[in-house]
Amino acid sequence: MSNQRIRIRLKSFDHRLIDQSAQEIVETAKRTGAQVCGPIPMPTRIERFNVLTSPHVNKDARDQYEIRTYKRLIDIVQPTDKTVDALMKLDLAAGVDVQIALG
């Protein structure tokens, strides 16, 4: 397992939640003796929506909404067996999407 690399991608709508989850992952990996690169903040994706408030006339009256998607990237360079076991047992917040890739 020493030649592999674990890449963890985190996505969330709440930046506080994603930073807290990334910190937990980094602390867990360092505690088990692995080298960690990150968390690396990726560009924030902003989706904006314009909605007409009036059903008939007044096209100038609109509401504007946006959804921000925050992303973080964590690389674990030299994972040990303890690292993988600790990451599997780690309980993260419900609002964070986690993708794990071995490379």
UniProtKB/Swiss-Prot annotation:
GO terms for biological process: translation. The keyword Ribonucleoprotein applies. This is Small ribosomal subunit protein uS10. Involved in the binding of tRNA to the ribosomes. Part of the 30S ribosomal subunit. The lineage of its organism: Bacteria, Pseudomonadati, Pseudomonadota, Gammaproteobacteria, Moraxellales. It comes from Acinetobacter baumannii (strain AB0057). PROSITE patterns: RIBOSOMAL_S10. GO terms for cellular component: ribonucleoprotein complex; ribosome. Keywords: Ribonucleoprotein, Ribosomal protein. Belongs to the universal ribosomal protein uS10 family. The keyword Mitochondrion does not apply. It comes from the Bacteria. One of its GO terms (molecular function) is tRNA binding. SMART domains: Ribosomal_S10. NCBIfam families: PRK00596.1, rpsJ_bact.
